[in-house]
């Protein structure tokens, strides 16, 4: 049995069946010849695999989620004297019996979930890398660009959009003494969102921030005149970009995020 052939049949990529077969075969001193047959959608393909397996005296291991396909393979393989092992079917049936829930019978679900997970991780890493204007190159790479003065929820909003919407978000702080990065004027305005807040609200937030750091709330950072100067600068920059502005004064992060997501969906950007 040095070259025992195993046909791995799947209605998706076949990674699950492949891994299970290799794990099982690893318990034996011979090297199997594993041949994967992915994306099987019809009984014609199954019939062909059974015929080939019979001529090669091979074993068929399969992950097919649709009951009719599973039953067809088991029945026809038995008629031809071919050993066929259902890797996932009995477990699906058992879970259905225990939970009373009807399965989706949808191929490739795990793979799609994995892809979504990695998209989320990528978006989170992007938000960290391009947080607070650390690298202006992120502006042109981002799905969303948040623009605002200090303490307008840019960072938590970036993280929320990454975690929950898998969007790559860069955020850019604006201060009167520093010219905005040129990339802000190069990126599509539809991707940009200015975050504004009423002066009194921001004044309170900044004072609380200073107190939490053990600093005097009389610092310039929390001075109402300084805040107004920053807001004026923000409005000047935003008018040049001509992007949508969201008043975050009394909005939760989730509410602001929904406004942004609805806007980009309406524009069919993603």
From Swiss-Prot:
Documented EC number(s): 2.7.11.32, 2.7.4.27
Family assignment from sequence similarity: Belongs to the pyruvate, phosphate/water dikinase regulatory protein family. PDRP subfamily.
Reactions it catalyzes: N(tele)-phospho-L-histidyl/L-threonyl-[pyruvate, phosphate dikinase] + ADP = N(tele)-phospho-L-histidyl/O-phospho-L-threonyl-[pyruvate, phosphate dikinase] + AMP + H(+); N(tele)-phospho-L-histidyl/O-phospho-L-threonyl-[pyruvate, phosphate dikinase] + phosphate + H(+) = N(tele)-phospho-L-histidyl/L-threonyl-[pyruvate, phosphate dikinase] + diphosphate
NCBIfam families: PRK05339.1 (NF003742)
Chain sites annotated for binding ADP: 148-155
InterPro entries hit by this protein: Kinase-pyrophosphorylase, PPDK_reg
Function, in words: Bifunctional serine/threonine kinase and phosphorylase involved in the regulation of the pyruvate, phosphate dikinase (PPDK) by catalyzing its phosphorylation/dephosphorylation.
MF terms (GO), sorted A to Z: ADP binding; ATP binding; phosphotransferase activity, phosphate group as acceptor; protein serine/threonine kinase activity
Keywords in alphabetical order: Kinase, Nucleotide-binding, Serine/threonine-protein kinase, Transferase
Keyword Cell inner membrane attributed: no
Domain of life: Bacteria
Keyword Zinc-finger: no
Listed name of the protein: Putative pyruvate, phosphate dikinase regulatory protein
């Amino acid at each position: 049995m040095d070259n025992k052939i195993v046909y791995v049949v799947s209605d998706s990529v076949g990674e699950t069946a492949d891994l299970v077969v290799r794990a099982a075969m690893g318990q034996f001193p011979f090297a199997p010849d594993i041949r994967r047959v992915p994306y099987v959608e019809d009984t014609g393909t199954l019939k062909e695999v059974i015929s080939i397996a019979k001529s090669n005296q091979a074993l068929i291991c399969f992950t097919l989620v649709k009951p009719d396909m599973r039953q067809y393979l088991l029945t026809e393989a038995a008629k031809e004297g071919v050993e066929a092992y259902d890797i996932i079917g009995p477990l699906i049936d058992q879970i259905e019996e225990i939970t009373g829930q009807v399965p989706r019978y949808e191929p490739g679900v795990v793979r799609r979930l994995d892809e979504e997970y990695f998209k989320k991780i990528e978006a989170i890493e992007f938000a960290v890398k391009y947080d607070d204007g650390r690298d202006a190159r992120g502006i042109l790479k981002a799905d969303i660009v948040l623009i605002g003065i200090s303490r307008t929820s840019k960072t938590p909003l970036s993280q929320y959009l990454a975690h929950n919407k898998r969007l790559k978000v860069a955020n850019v702080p604006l201060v009167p003494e520093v010219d905005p990065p040129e990339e802000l004027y190069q990126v599509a305005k539809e991707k940009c969102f200015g975050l504004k807040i009423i002066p009194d609200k921001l004044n309170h937030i900044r004072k609380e921030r200073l107190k939490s750091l053990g600093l005097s709330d009389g610092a310039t950072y929390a001075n109402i005149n300084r805040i107004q100067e920053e807001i004026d600068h923000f409005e000047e920059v935003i008018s040049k970009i001509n992007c949508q502005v969201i008043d975050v004064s009394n909005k939760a992060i989730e509410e602001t995020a929904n406004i942004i997501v609805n806007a980009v969906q309406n524009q069919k950007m993603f």
